[in-house]
Amino acid sequence: FGGNIHMRRYPLQCDRGVIVSGRAGGVSSFFDSAVGGTGPHPLSGMGSGFRRIKTDEPVLVDLVHAHRGYIVDMTRMFVAGTLSQEWHQRLEDMLAVKDTVVDVLDQGKTCEAAWDEAYGLAVEFGYQENLMGMKPDQSRFLGHSVGLQLDESPVVAAGFDRPLPIGGAMAIEPKVVYAEGCIGREDAWIRDQEGMRPVTADGAWPWLTEW
């Protein structure tokens, strides 16, 4: 499980995964992503560092896999112990935001419409300051197309006034970020003639695993 993932935005390439816990989950990325992490060194400031995982804090695992060159992206949450009710509620709210994105894209509406509806729901939940990062480093998207590269188009964001095409694949990844950590979920979806269906596990793999 190694190597880099190609990105459309030159000259970036992406590591295969980000694993962050607690306060490391509140560290922003050097590129347009909700979660960055400390990395092992300031000169490699992305992903896992040397911070020890503490009891009852959220652990986010965001992994990218390439099968015969085609990319999928998936995020799940873990906790050593028990997650607080506050973090549980945040995760439930992000699942509702995800369902909104999937529903709008399933209807063949534009990616911008999916952003508008899902972002509006997140604001209604009270996440305007924390959705996809903390100000001033918030990312302004809720999903990105995937294919031969990680950051394909269209994107669930303002300005993308076209639908996800039939045969298109989209990683949908609402997350909320705080100084004390982050939480969210992500799965890759494909739109076919019958609508949206998950390529990765979606609800078949638990959103949260306690150990």
Question: PLM features: residue spans?
Answer:
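Active-site neighborhoods and metal-handling regions in enzymes and metal-associated proteins
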Residues: 1-211
